[in-house]
């Protein structure tokens, strides 16, 4: 097991055991022993304070992977969000992604610098989508969902995500989430893909399910999408 970092005592001081029990139920890929139980607002606050008060220790922490505890990984992501330059933020992210082992860490950190440098970030996303690591792929799709379905949208992104072939549940769920959000934000561009029924039955049907659960999609469209569900084996 990796050595505990210097920040573990701080995390233990913020421990909320019932919250840890709750988090464990949501993250079946982790053992309970790896979850301290710290709420996200407390972790974000700690990341901001540590960046200001202990920059050298933060730098050491960001260069030391892997970590022991789930909350160390969450803190790692939030510390990357505090980095002031794009080059450092992307370098730290590149180093961190292979060590992400669950959806919760994957989905909770997203440096604002990536939004300010969409073209540069996109070149990295293209590589992440080709990764053998499922959570690296999921992270790349997640950035396309959050940062590239409005002003920076390009229809080629739909094709890129559609081309991803994976047996990983957490990859396919993110693909479905992406296309459901794309239906809400870029309906005209996304609908032909759903109509083509070329996605796997799991992704196709989950996309339609999530779209039908969305408050941003009209009831008329929700009913219309039902005809494109695929039979499951």
Write out the residue ranges for each language-model feature.
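Alpha-helical scaffold domains
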Residues: 1-233
């Amino acid at each position: 097991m990796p050595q505990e970092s210097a920040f573990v005592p701080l995390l233990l001081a913020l421990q909320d055991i019932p919250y840890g029990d709750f988090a464990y139920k949501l993250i079946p890929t982790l053992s309970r022993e790896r979850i301290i139980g710290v709420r996200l607002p407390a972790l974000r606050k700690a990341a901001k304070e540590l960046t200001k008060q202990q920059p050298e220790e933060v730098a050491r922490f960001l260069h030391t992977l892997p970590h022991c505890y789930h909350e160390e990984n969450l803190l790692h992501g939030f510390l990357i969000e505090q980095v002031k330059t794009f080059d450092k933020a992307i370098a730290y992210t590149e180093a961190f992604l292979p060590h992400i082992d669950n959806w919760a860490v994957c989905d909770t950190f997203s440096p604002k610098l990536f939004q300010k440098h969409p073209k540069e970030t996109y070149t990295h996303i293209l590589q992440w989508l080709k990764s053998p690591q499922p959570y690296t792929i999921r992270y790349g799709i997640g950035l396309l969902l959050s940062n590239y379905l409005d002003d920076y949208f390009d229809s080629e992104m739909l094709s890129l995500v559609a081309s991803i072939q994976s047996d990983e549940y957490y990859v396919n769920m993110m693909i479905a989430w992406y296309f459901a959000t794309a239906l809400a934000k870029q309906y005209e561009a996304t609908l032909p893909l759903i109509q083509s029924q070329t996605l796997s039955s799991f992704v196709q049907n989950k996309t339609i399910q999530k779209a039908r659960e969305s408050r941003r999609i009209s009831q008329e469209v929700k009913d219309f999408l039902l005809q494109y569900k695929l039979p499951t084996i």
